[in-house]
């Protein structure tokens, strides 16, 4: 029997340093193993809405996370807080607030790094993991490409500018 898909709730939590964090909760009464979706470096929780809707319709609860400074989470004026340890603490606070003691994780890029770190630091928490756009070895050329554009993107005034910017950021991956 297929479950009734639920609309997501926008939830907020105060981080250890007082910053307001946002995440999406696609509830599903009676779900046993929640799925936690962790996005890439510059991406929001909304990236997972289609996946969350499908999983939710199958009876799974889904939590999708906005890291600090992304999506609807508050921007942090201290740039040193944009690091894996601080973000991992943020993720754990959300899971604690939601009563999640074990989950399946879907991690894209930086979210995959968080998933692997959580599996190392909290093996009791990670029951299953799906890693997207990341693996145990990180290609240096890819990191250099990302560094070229993160935090440096100009305003986009036209579709021509958007295409040029996509070619620049994606390199040879954009035909």
Predicted regions and their residues:
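Conserved HGGG/HGGXW glycine-rich cap/lid loop of the alpha/beta-hydrolase fold
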Residues: 24-74
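Short, glycine-/aromatic-enriched active-site segment of Class I SAM-dependent methyltransferases
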Residues: 140-149
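Alpha/beta-hydrolase fold catalytic core
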Residues: 1-35, 57-60, 100-101
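Conserved hydrolase catalytic core segment
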Residues: 101-140
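Short, hydrophobic alpha-helix immediately C-terminal to the catalytic nucleophile
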Residues: 49, 92, 116-120
